[in-house]
């Protein structure tokens, strides 16, 4: 569930868009970090974990897809939402293949759609994070079980040898 500690990064070269998105999300209790530069955003991602990253597609110096492609390597669990005024088939295909975009939002967006998309993106982030924890616990449990199995196999070999030796003494 969203709360004050749910961090969202917003990247758009237009301050007015950053402000509009933030004004929609802040009343819902999200903690917003915003920047007009995708390059600055990449540096921010190296310092702080985000549940959701929202980015414009058309920005000077780097497209939203290029940004998401790099952001994915820094924070693979974060849900990525692309906001764009022009949605072409090429953008959609590239977004899926290169940036693993969670959702698209068209400009101008509908506030309720934005809020629902962000809520779903946070839910996805939480599931992916829990899954990563469960995978690590499974690896640790499997390692422990392998170690126990190896120890039991050694003890079994010792007991089998002792049993064979006793059977020989009775013959």
Located regions from the model:
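Two-component/phosphorelay signaling modules centered on CheY-like receiver
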Residues: 6, 15-33
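Acidic catalytic/metal-coordinating carboxylates
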Residues: 6, 36-37, 63-66
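Amphipathic alpha-helical coiled-coil "transmission" helices that mediate dimerization
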Residues: 126-171
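Active-site residues of response regulator receiver
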Residues: 56, 84
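Receiver (REC) domain active-site loop signature in two-component systems and cognate sites
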Residues: 59
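Acidic, metal-coordinating helix/loop segments flanking the phosphotransfer/catalytic sites
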Residues: 34-52
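Non-catalytic signal-transmission and effector/linker regions of two-component phosphorelay proteins
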Residues: 1-9
């Amino acid at each position: 569930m969203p709360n004050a500690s749910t961090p969202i990064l917003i990247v758009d070269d237009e301050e007015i868009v950053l402000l509009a998105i933030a004004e929609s999300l802040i009343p819902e209790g999200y903690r917003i970090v915003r920047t007009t530069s995708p390059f600055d955003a990449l540096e921010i991602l190296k310092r702080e974990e985000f549940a959701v990253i929202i980015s414009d597609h058309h920005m000077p110096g780097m497209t939203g897809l290029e940004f998401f492609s790099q952001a994915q390597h820094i924070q693979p669990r974060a849900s990525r939402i692309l906001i764009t005024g022009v949605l072409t088939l090429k953008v959609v295909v590239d977004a899926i293949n290169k940036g693993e975009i969670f959702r698209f939002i068209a400009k101008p967006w509908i506030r309720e759609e934005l809020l629902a998309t962000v809520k779903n993106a946070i839910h996805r982030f939480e599931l992916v994070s829990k899954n990563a924890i469960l995978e690590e616990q499974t690896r640790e449990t499997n390692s422990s079980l392998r170690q126990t199995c190896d120890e039991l196999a050694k003890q079994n070999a010792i007991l089998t040898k002792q049993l064979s030796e006793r059977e020989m003494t009775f013959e």
